[in-house]
Amino acid sequence: MSSIRKTYVLKLYVAGNTPNSVRALRTLNHILETEFQGVYALKVIDVLKNPQLAEEDKILATPTLAKVLPPPVRKIIGDLSDRERVLIGLDLLYEELSDGIMEY
């Protein structure tokens, strides 16, 4: 197994400092620190302050989480509280499981 680890680049689009935005960020930080310690970069974008970024990335609802790298780009819209749903939606759960496979 290779010792080189991928770096995951993620963007979280929120609309202000609402309870949903705060909860999404807290949950996402927990998932990232638990599953991807030190191999991720997260950028939080407030679409109320930066509507042009939301428009460029075709964000229609918040919260939206986008995995930019490694390709392909994946997006999850809405509730981010379910760890498994987030990992599957971003196409990350399979890689996590395959890393733990042991050969006998």
UniProtKB/Swiss-Prot annotation:
- Domain of life according to the entry: Bacteria
Keywords, alphabetical: Biological rhythms
Q: Which cysteines are joined by disulfide bonds?
A: none
Q: Which Gene3D superfamilies match?
A: Glutaredoxin
The keyword Zinc belongs to this UniProt entry's keyword annotation = no
Q: Which GO terms describe its biological process?
A: circadian rhythm
Q: Which SMART domains match?
A: KaiB
CDD domains, sorted: KaiB_like
Q: Does Transferase show up as a keyword for this record?
A: no
Q: Which SUPFAM superfamilies match?
A: Thioredoxin-like
Annotated membrane-spanning segments are none
Q: What is known of its domains?
A: Has 2 forms, fold switches to a thioredoxin-like fold (KaiB(fs)) when bound to KaiC.
Function field: Key component of the KaiABC oscillator complex, which constitutes the main circadian regulator in cyanobacteria. Complex composition changes during the circadian cycle to control KaiC phosphorylation. KaiA stimulates KaiC autophosphorylation, while KaiB sequesters KaiA, leading to KaiC autodephosphorylation. Phospho-Ser-431 KaiC accumulation triggers binding of KaiB to form the KaiB(6):KaiC(6) complex, leading to changes in output regulators CikA and SasA. KaiB switches to a thioredoxin-like fold (KaiB(fs)) when bound to KaiC.
Q: How does it assemble?
A: The KaiABC complex composition changes during the circadian cycle to control KaiC phosphorylation. Complexes KaiC(6), KaiA(2-4):KaiC(6), KaiB(6):KaiC(6) and KaiC(6):KaiB(6):KaiA(12) are among the most important forms, many form cooperatively. Undergoes a major conformational rearrangment; in the free state forms homotetramers as a dimer of dimers. When bound to the CI domain of KaiC switches to a monomeric thioredoxin-fold (KaiB(fs)). KaiB(fs) binds CikA, leading it to dephosphorylate phospho-RpaA.
Q: Which family does it belong to?
A: Belongs to the KaiB family.
Protein name per its UniProtKB record: Circadian clock oscillator protein KaiB
The UniProt gene name for this protein comes to: kaiB
